[in-house]
């Protein structure tokens, strides 16, 4: 059996298993930080739930909803059904969707349909292609063409690669490779971490390279270090490496505080509910992305389960926005937000002005 295809199957199986671990094991470490982020109740919102405007944009591409079905899978025949189900739900709800890493499809045309199915099922939706940071401009263009993508997602995942027995060990030249893809890609580029968090320093480098959007993808969601340790059969994995990364709320807050012009932020990692997404919008994200909870429901209940979950997610997002007094995604970025606990301490030490966040007002 092809090693890459088997790895795809392993990732789906173990990602679903991770989501089912409630409460999470001690090795899971701290969460994404959303429990430390508090929206201030607005008792006189003067808003109607049906009129909450969820439209937003990322890198100049308009999104009907500020929620993205994030990259999960592709590259093996038996995961095609997963992408088919997710694409059908994305089409019905008007959600953008990213495919999983297309390296397998670029190397083996026989599995390319596991990605192409997304565009076939959702011909008018927003689709994100997906390549690694070591891809060439030619590979990036081919990935975009494969799914007729509107955006190109470039993923960063050094901690996962180092835990993977067959993973990369040399990460030199990645920023230069990203800059070349940005220059030559036919669509805007979104750079995405894979659950380990983008720091403000890396965000500056990506911005200087011309990247238009960053998915901070912090710790607190699916733990790919844990997944790779399970795949490798480690009996005593290093907890410091298995729990490596910046919690999502911390990463988002410190990157948003930079105020980098023309750099849109997406938040992912531990976003399980609509209120989590609302908190992400308040901290500066233009959209929130979800993967693990969606995959778990697809594995358990198929497209119907995914549809029910995401419908409730959007309903709860609208409710949280109304209760915070925000009638739009832009307005949500101006409501007061109080950050406490570990997340607050991280932000304070990293120079985020928490007093300004807590005392601002959209009105």
Curated annotation (Swiss-Prot):
GO CC annotation: cytoplasm
The residues that hold Mg(2+) are 161
Q: Which family does it belong to?
A: Belongs to the IPP isomerase type 2 family.
Annotated residues that bind FMN are located at 71-73, 101, 130, 192, 217, 222, 270-272, 291-292
Report keywords, A-Z.
Cytoplasm, Flavoprotein, FMN, Isomerase, Isoprene biosynthesis, Magnesium, Metal-binding, NADP
SMART domains membership: IMPDH (SM01240)
The protein, known as: Isopentenyl-diphosphate delta-isomerase
Coarse class of the protein's main subcellular location:
cytoplasm
Recorded catalytic reaction(s): these are: isopentenyl diphosphate = dimethylallyl diphosphate
For this protein, the Enzyme Commission number is 5.3.3.2
Instruction: Tell me the cofactors it needs.
Output: FMN; NADPH; Mg(2+)
Q: Which organism is it from?
A: Symbiobacterium thermophilum (strain DSM 24528 / JCM 14929 / IAM 14863 / T)
Binding sites annotated in the UniProt record for substrate: 7-8, 160
> What is a GO molecular function of this protein?
isopentenyl-diphosphate delta-isomerase activity
Subcellular localization, per the record?
Cytoplasm
Function (record text): Involved in the biosynthesis of isoprenoids. Catalyzes the 1,3-allylic rearrangement of the homoallylic substrate isopentenyl (IPP) to its allylic isomer, dimethylallyl diphosphate (DMAPP).
> InterPro entries annotated for this entry?
Aldolase_TIM, FMN-dep_DH, IPdP_isomerase
From which residue to which does any coiled coil extend? none
Please cite one Gene Ontology biological process associated with this protein: isoprenoid biosynthetic process
Q: Where is the signal peptide, in residue numbers?
A: none
Which is one Pfam family of this protein?
FMN_dh
Oligomeric state and interaction partners are given as: Homooctamer. Dimer of tetramers.
């Amino acid at each position: 059996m092809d090693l890459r295809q088997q790895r795809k199957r392993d990732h789906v199986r173990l990602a679903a298993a991770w989501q089912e671990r409630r409460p999470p094991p001690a090795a899971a470490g701290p969460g994404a930080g959303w429990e430390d982020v508090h929206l201030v109740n607005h008792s006189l919102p003067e808003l109607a739930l049906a009129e909450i405007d969820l439209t937003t944009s990322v890198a100049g591409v308009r999104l009907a909803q500020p929620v993205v079905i994030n990259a999960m899978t592709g590259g093996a025949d038996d995961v095609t059904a997963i992408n088919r189900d997710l694409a059908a739900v994305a089409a019905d709800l008007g959600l953008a969707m990213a495919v999983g890493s297309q390296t397998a499809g670029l190397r083996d045309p026989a599995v390319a349909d596991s990605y192409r199915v997304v565009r076939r099922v959702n011909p008018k939706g927003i689709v994100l292609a997906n390549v690694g940071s070591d891809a060439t401009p030619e590979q990036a263009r081919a990935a975009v063409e494969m799914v007729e993508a509107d955006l190109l997602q470039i993923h960063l995942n050094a901690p996962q690669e180092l835990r993977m027995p067959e993973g990369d060990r040399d990460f030199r030249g990645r920023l230069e490779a990203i800059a070349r893809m940005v220059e030559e890609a036919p669509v805007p580029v979104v750079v995405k971490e894979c659950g380990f968090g983008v720091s403000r320093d890396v965000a500056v480098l990506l911005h200087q390279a011309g990247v238009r959007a960053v998915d901070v993808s912090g710790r607190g969601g699916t733990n790919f270090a844990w997944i790779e340790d399970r795949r490798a059969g480690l009996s005593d994995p290093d907890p410091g490496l298995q729990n490596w990364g910046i919690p999502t709320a911390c990463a988002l807050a410190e990157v948003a505080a930079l105020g980098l012009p023309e750099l849109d932020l997406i938040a992912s990692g531990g976003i399980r509910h609509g209120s989590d997404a609302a908190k992400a919008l308040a901290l500066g994200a233009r959209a929130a992305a979800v993967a693990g909870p969606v995959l778990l429901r697809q594995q358990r209940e198929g497209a119907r389960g995914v549809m029910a979950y995401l419908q409730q997610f959007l309903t709860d997002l609208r409710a949280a926005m109304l209760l915070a007094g925000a009638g739009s995604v832009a307005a949500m970025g101006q409501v007061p937000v109080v950050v406490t606990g570990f997340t607050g301490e991280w932000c304070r030490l990293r120079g985020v002005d928490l007093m300004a966040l807590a005392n601002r007002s959209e009105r």
